[in-house]
């Protein structure tokens, strides 16, 4: 058993299942029937969804929510989030955006804050709408643009390309009268954003994209925030721009409520005037923390719509491991097994990176990975099976060398809080 130095957010598997090929064909089409696309996505197995980042969703959502809900609920939300990203991305870009024309369509969102945004813009200092890669975030700027509010949307390079293709394909669409998109991974885009705000314009940003000129992994202009006990280093450049120009910031998210697309509007953070020095720094830090508090609280009831959750590990900080002495962990483990108990993975802490039988496990808090040898399939299965688990009888049936290796691995996991010890029909975390 060995540690894996790092994990990759997206899995590139050698063999792609037929269901994935079929879904990929549908997702590349503007003419596919929405009901068929949705049904095909729901029918994907967890192994199929591993090709679309399910492993990362599981790890990241478990790190955030594992102390707030049962592991089974988190795994369900991770699956929903992976499907939501595929479904809502296709539905917007291939079914909605590609069919717009000269007549603005009715708004897709309920409780769209048109009057609130107009009121902020009337102050003459511009305005920023801060949202997240969550739910119907794409509908917020397009609905506002169709309502006659000129809006600029900063995007990463790939997302920018999606909108630019749509604009070139249907330049006559009413959307483009008030909707402008810029790539903030290029200097011209960032400059255009600053000029737009300086002139009193409106900007909408999905701030958890956490990208800029240095890309999503760059270290420039970052603040450390706490989300449900997990720290993350997030971009603050747009908030600093708001402080510089005195632009108020209104947080808005759009999620599903009783089957409807509904906006939720949160209190405005208003610098009141252009700020400099310590005043600007204090405003930026307070506002960034407040915005990510909004995201964290929203995830408690809408994590299944967080399409950005598969990239959270790029900007969250690993938690330190409270590791007890190996001898203490070994004694506790031996005590439970000697009394006919069993040991299994604590799935709120350590989980397989894919479905049963996977040989790699990850500590969702520290992001430390463990790899089992290819011939340890039975061991991997037992670790994940609460009904069987690892027992003294199973260990005693192993050869001497293999038993020693397995035992040490179990003791290490126990010392790092990665095992649950079951005995006398009770459960205790080790």
Where are these regions (language model features)?
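N-terminal targeting/anchoring "stem" of glycan-biosynthesis enzymes
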Residues: 1-55, 62-65, 301-314, 321-357, ...
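Membrane-anchoring hydrophobic helices of lipid-metabolizing enzymes
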Residues: 2-131, 136-137, 141-142, 166-172, ...
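Short, basic, glycine/proline-bearing loop/turn elements
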Residues: 100-104, 173-181, 219-227
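Short, surface-exposed basic-aromatic patches at helix termini and helix-loop junctions that form
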Residues: 142-149
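Short internal beta-strands
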Residues: 152-160
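Active-site glycine- and acidic-residue-rich loops that bind
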Residues: 178-190
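Non-catalytic C-terminal accessory region of glycerolipid acyltransferases
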Residues: 189-359, 365, 374, 411
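Long, charge-rich, low-complexity alpha-helical segments
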Residues: 371-430
């Amino acid at each position: 058993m060995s540690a894996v130095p790092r994990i990759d957010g997206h899995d590139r598997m050698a063999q792609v299942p037929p269901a994935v090929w079929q879904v990929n064909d549908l997702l590349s089409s503007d003419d596919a029937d929405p009901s068929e696309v949705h049904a095909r996505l729901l029918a994907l197995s967890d192994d199929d969804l591993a090709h679309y980042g399910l492993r990362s969703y599981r790890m990241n959502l478990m790190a955030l929510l594992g102390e707030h809900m049962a592991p089974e609920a988190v795994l369900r939300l991770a699956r929903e989030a992976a499907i939501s990203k595929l479904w809502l991305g296709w539905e917007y870009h291939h079914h909605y955006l590609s069919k717009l024309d000269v007549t603005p369509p009715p708004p897709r969102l309920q409780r769209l804050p048109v009057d609130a945004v107009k009121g902020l813009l009337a102050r003459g200092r511009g305005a920023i709408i801060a949202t997240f890669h969550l739910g119907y975030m794409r509908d917020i700027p397009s609905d506002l643009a169709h309502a006659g509010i000129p809006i600029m949307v900063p995007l990463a390079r790939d997302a920018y390309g999606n909108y630019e293709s749509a604009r070139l394909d249907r330049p006559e669409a009413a959307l483009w009268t008030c909707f402008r998109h810029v790539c903030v991974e290029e200097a011209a885009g960032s400059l255009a954003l600053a000029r737009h705000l300086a002139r009193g314009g409106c900007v909408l940003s999905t701030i958890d994209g956490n990208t800029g000129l240095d890309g999503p992994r760059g270290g420039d202009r970052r603040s450390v925030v706490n989300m449900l006990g997990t720290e993350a280093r997030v971009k603050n450049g747009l908030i600093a721009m708001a402080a510089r120009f005195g632009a108020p910031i209104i947080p808005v998210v759009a999620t599903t409520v009783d089957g409807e697309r509904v906006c939720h509007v949160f209190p405005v953070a208003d610098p009141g005037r252009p700020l400099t020095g310590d005043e600007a720094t204090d405003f930026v830090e307070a506002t960034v923390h407040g915005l990510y508090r909004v995201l964290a609280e929203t995830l408690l009831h809408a994590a299944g719509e967080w399409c950005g959750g598969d990239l959270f590990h790029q900007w969250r900080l690993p938690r330190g491991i409270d590791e007890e002495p190996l001898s203490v962990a070994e004694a506790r483990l031996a005590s439970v097994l000697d009394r006919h108990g069993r040991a299994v993975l604590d799935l709120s802490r350590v989980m397989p990176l894919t479905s049963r039988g996977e040989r790699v496990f990850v500590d969702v808090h520290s992001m430390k990975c463990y790899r089992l040898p290819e011939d340890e399939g039975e061991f991997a299965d037992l670790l994940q099976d609460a009904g069987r688990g690892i027992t003294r009888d199973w260990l005693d049936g192993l050869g001497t060398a293999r038993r020693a290796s397995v035992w040490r691995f179990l003791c290490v996991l126990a010392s790092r809080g990665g095992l649950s010890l079951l005995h006398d029909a009770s459960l205790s975390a080790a």
